[in-house]
Amino acid sequence: MAAKKTAQRKSTTPSYTVPGMTTKEGGEIAAVLQDRLNALTDLHLTLKHVHWNVVGPQFIAVHEMLDPQVDAVRAMSDVLAERIATLGASPVGTPGSLVAQRSWDDYSLGRAGAIEHLGALDVVYTGVIEDHREAIEKTGDPDPVTEDILIAQSGQLELFHWFIRAHLEDPGGHLATASASTERSAAAKTARVSTR
């Protein structure tokens, strides 16, 4: 028999946190980190999904490029979960919680060509990095340790984003995904460019 579905606990102020911060600040930082944990968990699953569903002439290059990114992003998730626990809160990593708390839709491509997936991943990485930068701004004053963690992760995410974009850039420095705001529109733009 399946477990009965229960309401998800709301994040509360922890009973303790790290020295030099109030429990209220610890709870607020933990909430910011939970959002980032959700995003990174979603990202590493999305990267693995693309790894399994990429097809076409660039298959092997993209397939092999993604596994190290999956591993690194999964490790980033672990660091954030452990920081949440260090702050006295309880990290939540269940699929239902992630889906309930996220502010974005599921990755929208299934089996598709390498270039289409790379175009869609450009949009995905842009969103994750923009939100990580916002989290840096929110955490810096009360918690420079968390800020440093997020800065280091942002640097690694930006490197991975460059790996993706290098496939989408022409010699003049123009991205095939310029002005695309959705995964599907980015995939469509890259498909048009790759057929020329």
Where is each model-derived feature located?
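Acidic, low-complexity proline/glycine-rich segments
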Residues: 1-19
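Short amphipathic alpha-helical segments with heptad-repeat character
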Residues: 27-41, 67-70, 74, 119-122, ...
